[in-house]
Swiss-Prot record:
Keywords: Developmental protein, Flowering, Metal-binding, Nucleus, Repressor, Transcription, Transcription regulation, Zinc, Zinc-finger. This is Protein LATE FLOWERING. The keyword Transcription applies. Transmembrane segments: none annotated. It comes from Arabidopsis thaliana.
């Protein structure tokens, strides 16, 4: 094996510097380095290209960061078990980004706390469900549970086609 270093004497002191051959091998190995994108698994040959590409994922990173903060907040605050959870159906795109399979739905998510009421509304249809966790729960997911559902249907009146209603939205205090 060749020694790619040589000694240089500078004012009575010896200094070891790499030779030109060693610099060439360092350049070759640095050009072979691959920088993967953590969101879409694309690979880039320079960190600058990866950085530019990651700007395209800014919305996804923000959504993932918000979801993590909300999850941490709920799990670190004991008083929240008395508050109802209002659920809306997340888009499949956001479920996939957050690490849930594309087939996931709201029902797949872990319950926050036993006996925690859950409200869900889809326009005229309102559901209140209270989950009672059993002994077979593992890791926050309920294997067996009893769900009490209070289901109400409300008549929603739509305005005539093409006619707008004028509503007074001012708040008089």
């Amino acid at each position: 094996m060749e020694d790619h270093y040589h000694q240089v004497e500078v004012e009575g002191e010896e200094e070891i510097k790499p030779s030109k051959e060693a610099n060439k091998t360092d350049e070759n190995t640095s050009s072979l380095r691959i920088f993967p994108c953590l969101f879409c698994s694309r690979k880039f040959h320079s960190s600058q290209a990866l950085g530019g590409h990651q700007n395209a994922h800014k919305k996804e990173r923000t959504a993932a960061r918000r979801a993590k903060r909300a999850y941490d907040f709920v799990n670190n605050n004991d008083f929240l078990h008395t508050l109802p959870v209002f659920l809306s159906s997340p888009s499949q795109h956001h479920l996939t980004i957050l690490g849930y399979p594309a087939s996931a739905s709201v029902a797949c998510f872990p319950t926050v706390h036993p006996d925690h009421p859950i409200f869900k509304s889809s326009g005229s249809h309102v559901v209140l469900a209270t989950s009672h966790q059993g002994r077979d729960c593992k890791g926050g997911y309920c294997c067996q549970q009893r769900v009490d559902i209070l289901d109400h249907h409300y008549n929603v009146v739509n305005s005539d086609k093409g006619k707008d209603q004028c509503l007074d939205l001012s708040l008089h205090l």
